[in-house]
């Protein structure tokens, strides 16, 4: 009978006395010595159901759920996996700065502690490719069993090295949204100074005055329409989150509490920004855009935007097959829902610009680069053997993501002979 439980039952219309409770007992998976995370049998932002989306970080999974860390992210394409081919189409390295482990103090509330993750481990993916695929296979089995999209928590035991499924429950946001006859698209009508970036949640845009909240004791400061800016959120924040026009957090990934609640409320959120509470100023007017791909941008000032509506039921039948022009892999899962006959042109140079962000010449010249440029290249290519390998992998991921989004329709990619040297040993 805490505040959160009472609020939930009232919101859902449950009688307090009629709700049954139970206690489950299961083996403790030693993910404090391994890794843990959450996976969905669909893309949480677009609702695209042909992928398994996995997040992973070191230590107990509570830090991922809380949004205390920015975890690694992996996308696995279901049809390719079931063909027995390599199915990982995208990997994103998270910062993973902290992890939760067991403490020697056995007293109540003190059995775990949070410690820093060594820099060398942060720059590595928490899971290898075989483990990613194995988790995706588990997720697919669970999804088929229940016959619906699922939200699954998992852990890797650091002692025996095995992967364990800890919890599985129905996905409750995207899967319940019926495919509407009218599609909304938020579009910025201008540009401005980008103050902070992070992981975009949803595809909407919100704007208002910044309200920096250090903790729950300051939640009363948030007014209707404010942009809530904080380090991270937990279930106690939900009443005040409903007032916000947008949410911005320093920490967290796409499966953290702030992201989940933002989807339920239908508002823009940018998580894992790192320094939002330091860069943004209380009372400052900003625009929070999640309408530009995986990266969410917080712009200085109130930038006008519009909401375009397309009534799919009114689209006329035409005698020619219309193919799409797609250059940003980050938007492919969204674009595939628009009526189409595949991709007629995916320019490799656009994929490089949107998916990689490093000029191929910088990869070729590494490490013989100016100090500041060399460090920037190393930072961008962390998690890979070298910048050249990073470049090759990200090109492959970009093409694979677009192909997976539109599968089994045809996707035509315009290659570039000028990149031939990147693939040479």
Range-by-range predicted roles:
Residues 354, 365-417:
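Active-site loops and adjacent core secondary-structure elements that bind or stabilize anionic groups
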